[in-house]
UniProtKB/Swiss-Prot annotation:
Homodimer. One of its GO terms (molecular function) is aminoacyl-tRNA deacylase activity. The keyword Nucleotide-binding applies. GO terms for biological process: prolyl-tRNA aminoacylation. Transmembrane segments: none annotated. It comes from the Bacteria. The gene is proS. HAMAP family: Pro_tRNA_synth_type1 (MF_01569). It is found in: Cytoplasm. This is Proline--tRNA ligase. Consists of three domains: the N-terminal catalytic domain, the editing domain and the C-terminal anticodon-binding domain. It comes from Pseudomonas putida (strain ATCC 700007 / DSM 6899 / JCM 31910 / BCRC 17059 / LMG 24140 / F1).
Length: 571
């Protein structure tokens, strides 16, 4: 491809509303253009990259035995009402009416549509297992679209759905898809981690997320430094570093604390180590009108997902209001504690191993110090309530936990029978009786993968693509292309490289565009391999080669360029 025949839309300036580096560089490199909040047009340069992601995804899905389909973006409300998600999904679901006033939505996901297809097409266990996938535009009406493609409203997604007569078959396909996902991200040259995850609003019983590691990631990715254990922050089990509760060394005492409404103030004004404090959080219970006390250490954070898994706690998690606290306890949020608390209490594992600690006295502006379990109050129910922190023991008993930031690019679920039961999707089993199908679902954010790859690989000059993702593998930059000797050598090399199967961008802009601008544009776009053709080099029988990640260029004999690139470029 020649730049004279291409839409080369690079920009020098970074748009003011672009915050994360992938958004900035995709705009500056001419990959995308903003149409409206959370909506982007893909330009030729960006689309070449996304098509490469799609191609790898397709190859791995096909290899895993999945069959490609294409479902409508617009879905009838009846299916969502049948599954119960029409009311549950909330404002992210873009709803609309047709001219006949019938309700529809723009699909954020396709569980209902695919289950409807399966119940109409499948009748016997002999047709199973069946795994169908599509690569299609999705829409979620995010309240605050931000970070470019990282959290837009419209995006390209690969979503697959599998149907099974039993759990064993589902597990087999799930494992195969897990491996296929690992193959995809490995082939794309990404540093990623698959992690155990919560199933969230999709539902089901078992899931894994796939995260590309990047400092700009929105999610915490947890993994062991000595094993293959990995989970997201919602799912990671928090194991206390302590194994035995120390014996008491202090007497229980009531202390005036008028200037200690927060943990930080308690530590600063009263000299209590933060690990000797607790947070008493009052939440609404699953039973109407009941409040539950959840207690974590002062330097730990409550994990809301873990909390809502407790049968006593309402889902979603709702904190008690100040009025509810006053009515039930007689004190405000900054003075609460488990001693003489007239509520059901659940404490975190780390709290159960504390001694000589401080708690609110359930009296405004007063705390108890020197509190000890069993001596001053009984040990209540103990549960895993907190987020893990770096350095915690790994739950598998091997090593300690490391926390890095990650960008979620894939998620796979074992849905079980959640949707098939709701939509009555069943077949006749081997015994001739109806069997409700078990389902799996498997998503990859295709457009997000492009942005995540940039977040993982860039410098102050621009994007650094690997060979698998680069829009072009080779930038061919002639200096003084208008001269006959340079033009002939360049055109001949361009033809040879193209015939050899390389993806080449020939920068044939005229002499008004300086060599410095050409080099800067190719580095901004991130093309991995650059060949410079100059009259001086040709006079010596050489061309100049430079890799995007290297500081210095090297001279290459003209007759060795093709062999060199065939060995260097990964295809």
């Amino acid at each position: 491809m020649r730049t004279s025949q291409y839409l080369l839309a690079t920009q020098k300036e970074t748009p003011a509303d672009a915050v994360v580096i992938s958004h900035q560089l995709m705009l500056r490199a001419g990959m995308i253009r903003k149409l409206a909040s959370g909506l982007y047009t893909w330009l030729p340069m960006g689309l070449r990259v996304m098509r490469k992601v799609e191609a790898v995804v397709r190859e791995e899905m096909n290899a895993a035995g999945a069959l490609e389909v294409l479902m409508p973006s617009i879905q009838p409300a009846e299916l969502w009402q049948e599954s119960g998600r029409w009311e549950q999904y909330g404002p992210e679901l873009l709803r609309l009416k047709d001219r006949h006033q019938r309700d529809f939505c723009v699909g954020p996901t396709h569980e209902e549509v695919i289950t409807d297809l399966a119940r109409n097409e499948l009748s016997s266990y002999k047709q199973l297992p069946l795994n169908l996938y599509q690569i299609q535009t999705k829409f979620r009406d995010e309240i605050r679209p931000r970070f470019g493609l990282m959290r837009g409203r419209e995006f390209i997604m690969k979503d697959a759905y599998s149907f099974h007569a039993d759990q064993a078959s589902l597990q087999e396909t799930y494992d195969r898809m897990h491996q296929a996902y690992s193959n995809v991200f490995t082939r794309l040259g990404l540093d990623f981690r698959p992690v155990q995850a919560d199933t969230g609003s999709i539902g089901g019983s078992y899931s894994h997320e796939f995260h590309v590691l990047a400092e700009s990631g929105e999610d915490d990715v947890i993994f062991s430094d000595s094993s293959d254990y990995a989970a997201n922050i919602e799912k990671a089990e928090a194991i206390p570093r302590e194994t035995v509760r120390p014996a008491p060394t202090e007497e229980l005492r009531l202390v005036d604390t008028p200037n200690a409404k927060t943990i930080a103030q308690l530590v600063e004004n009263h000299g209590l180590p933060i690990e000797k404090t607790v947070k008493t959080l009052i939440v609404r219970g699953a039973e109407e009108g009941k409040l539950i006390a959840l207690i974590v250490r002062g330097d730990h954070e409550l994990n809301e997902i873990k909390a809502t898994k407790l049968e006593q706690v309402a889902d979603p998690l709702v904190m008690a209001t100040e009025a509810e606290l006053r009515d039930a306890i007689g004190a405000g949020a900054g003075s609460l504690g488990p001693l003489n608390l007239p509520l059901e209490i659940i404490i975190d594992r780390s709290v159960a191993l504390m001694s000589d600690f401080g708690i609110g006295a359930n009296i405004d502006d007063k705390h108890y110090f020197g509190v000890n379990w069993e001596r001053d109050l009984p040990v209540p129910q103990v549960a895993d309530l907190r987020n893990v922190v770096e350095g915690d023991p790994s739950p598998d008993g091997q090593g300690t936990l490391v926390i890095k930031r990650g960008i979620e690019v894939g998620h796979i679920f074992q849905l079980g029978t959640k949707y098939s039961e709701a939509l009555k999707c069943q077949v006749l089993g081997e015994n001739g009786k109806p069997v409700v199908l078990s389902m799996g679902c498997y998503g990859i954010g295709v457009s997000r993968v492009v942005a995540a790859a940039i977040e993982q690989s860039y410098d102050d000059k621009g994007i650094i693509w690997n060979d698998a993702l680069a829009p072009f593998q080779i930038a061919l930059v002639p200096l003084r292309y208008e001269t006959e000797v340079v033009r002939e050598a360049t055109d001949k090399l361009y033809a040879e490289l193209t015939a050899a199967g390389f993806e080449v961008l020939l920068d044939d802009r005229d002499k008004k565009t300086s060599p410095g601008i050409k080099f800067a544009d190719m580095e901004l776009i991130g093309i991995p391999h650059r060949i410079v053709v100059s009259d001086r080099g040709l006079a010596e029988g050489n061309l100049e080669y430079k890799h995007r990640t290297e500081q210095d260029a090297q001279a290459l004999p003209l007759n060795e360029v093709l062999t060199f690139l065939q060995a260097r470029v990964r295809r």
